[in-house]
């Protein structure tokens, strides 16, 4: 039997520790912003996070599941075991001067934290530090594990970790993501596979002896044409994207002996992605057969659909509401206003999307009343029905292993588009720092709710069991597939 007073005291202990250690967390976030390392190359960023974990008394293990930059920091003993997920990879080609209200590239072609993962990883670390303090002070049984999860951007790092059993023993997992709005996520996302199709032909003089050539590029184009016809005959929520990554050279007078295309196949469930994948493979093989070329199918990565746990999401939402949004300085609001207005009319889209999914008219009106604000300081209404995202996240693979929930917290100006120079510019600002501390406290608070009241985890597990309906986790990544850094030869 838990006592509410103990829960509130425990939260205050954690929140005070988070405030006390905020300076070192801001330093770590800003340093990771400066490293801006892309998927599976995050060695410096990993060291920054691991150094803080070691200094705070966590037991650190690296190279989890044979993923070089995957790690964890553990504190405590016994049940429940709660995981806090952190990310720290950047995006290629998004270098940007910090604090600027216009696009200013400092190092052309360099990477940048256009998705705010410098904040994501450090806020989760801050939450783990707060939880550790609570466990020490309360003397209660329980374990907190901070997971350093690399390669979220295009690498599905957590899926590789899940394949290695990294999350199998967790009772619950919590994470968050930076954004322009604050809300508890109750929705789902699409599972996906990323696959390279490599066509091998035979070169020849395109004018003098075209009959001797077998064009790999012809095969690739025929494959793409076949997939275009397939699109009508898959589930409506499916998405099939592609990028031609090698056309066989720059000489039109040569029959191209090699060509390559990268496909990203999405659908609501892993089984649907697998079905579409097999059909795409047949199209690729048919294209090769038509052109007397050869195709090699190279599976790059995959991730599962997200199953947001509404029981834990509600705990996150309650803590976000209890804490309330940060207060910003006049200078910070001036900066936010310049960024938000610079986005243009599209800055209202995220707000309007939230309002559209409010069933209660009063709640919808309340959300829309914030239109025109430079920084959204309200918590979006809790939506138990959830909204399907047509994107994908490797948090999905964690959610198939244990009850998992995530929050979105405002860390940048209203309407800021993700994966943009505007996100990078705001990544070291007061907006970012205050938002990540808000997120850290909400995650720590939700975790303490679960340590103090075992019934919460019991209900979360019951919800997950009902959602699975007898299904079990099967990692979408096949045996032998290894994580690949961006730009690594396929």
List the predicted regions and their residue ranges.
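Conserved short loop/turn motifs at secondary-structure junctions
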Residues: 37-38, 147-151, 300-305
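Short, Lys/Arg-enriched N-terminal segments with co-localized hydrophobic residues
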Residues: 1-8
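Metal-dependent amide/peptide-bond hydrolase catalytic core
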Residues: 221-490
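Divalent metal-coordination and catalytic microenvironments
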Residues: 32, 73, 84, 117, ...
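General structural feature for long, well-ordered alpha-helical segments within catalytic domains
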Residues: 10, 21-28, 41-52, 80, ...
């Amino acid at each position: 039997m838990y006592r509410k007073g103990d829960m509130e005291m425990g939260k205050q202990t954690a929140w005070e520790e988070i405030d006390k250690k905020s300076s070192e967390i801001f330093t770590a976030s800003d340093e990771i912003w400066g490293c801006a390392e892309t998927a599976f190359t995050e060695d410096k960023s990993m060291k920054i996070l691991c150094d803080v974990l070691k200094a705070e008394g966590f037991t650190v293990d690296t190279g989890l599941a044979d993923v070089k930059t995957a790690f964890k920091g553990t504190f405590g003993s016994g049940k429940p075991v709660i995981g806090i997920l952190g990310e720290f990879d950047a995006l290629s080609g998004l270098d940007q001067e910090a604090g600027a209200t216009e696009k200013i590239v400092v190092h052309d072609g360099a990477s940048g934290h256009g998705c705010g993962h410098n904040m994501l990883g450090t806020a989760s670390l801050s939450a783990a530090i707060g939880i550790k303090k609570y466990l020490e002070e309360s003397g209660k049984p329980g374990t907190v594990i901070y997971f350093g999860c690399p390669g979220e951007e295009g690498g599905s790092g957590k899926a590789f970790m899940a394949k290695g059993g990294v999350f199998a023993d967790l009772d619950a997992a919590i994470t968050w993501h930076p954004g322009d709005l604050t809300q508890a996520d109750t929705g789902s996302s699409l599972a996906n596979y990323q696959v390279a199709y490599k066509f091998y032909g035979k070169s020849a003089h395109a004018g003098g002896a075209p009959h001797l050539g077998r064009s790999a590029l012809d095969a690739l184009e025929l494959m793409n044409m076949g997939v275009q016809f397939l699109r009508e005959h898959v589930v409506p929520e499916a998405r099939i994207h592609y990028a031609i990554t090698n056309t066989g050279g720059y000489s039109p007078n040569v029959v191209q002996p090699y060509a390559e295309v990268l496909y990203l196949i999405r659908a609501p469930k892993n089984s649907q992605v697998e079905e579409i994948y097999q059909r795409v493979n047949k199209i690729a093989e048919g294209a090769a057969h038509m052109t007397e070329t050869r195709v090699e199918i190279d599976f790059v990565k995959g991730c599962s659909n997200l199953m947001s746990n509404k029981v834990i999401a509600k705990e996150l939402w309650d803590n976000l509401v209890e804490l309330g949004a940060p207060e910003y300085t006049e200078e910070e609001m001036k900066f936010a206003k310049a960024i938000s207005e610079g986005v243009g009319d599209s800055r209202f889209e995220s707000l309007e999307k939230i309002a559209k999914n409010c069933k209660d008219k009063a709640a919808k009106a309340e959300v829309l009343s914030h239109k025109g604000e430079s920084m959204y300081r309200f918590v979006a209404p809790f939506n138990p029905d959830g909204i399907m995202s047509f994107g994908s996240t490797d948090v999905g693979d964690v959610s198939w292993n244990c009850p998992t929930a995530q929050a979105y917290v405002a860390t940048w100006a209203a309407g800021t588009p993700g994966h943009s120079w505007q996100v990078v510019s705001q990544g070291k600002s007061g907006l970012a720092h205050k938002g990540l501390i808000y997120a850290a406290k909400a995650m720590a608070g939700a975790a303490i709710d679960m340590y103090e009241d075992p019934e919460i985890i019991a209900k979360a597990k019951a919800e997950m069991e009902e959602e699975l309906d007898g299904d079990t986790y099967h990692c979408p990544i096949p045996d032998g597939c290894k994580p690949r850094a961006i730009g690594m030869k396929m």
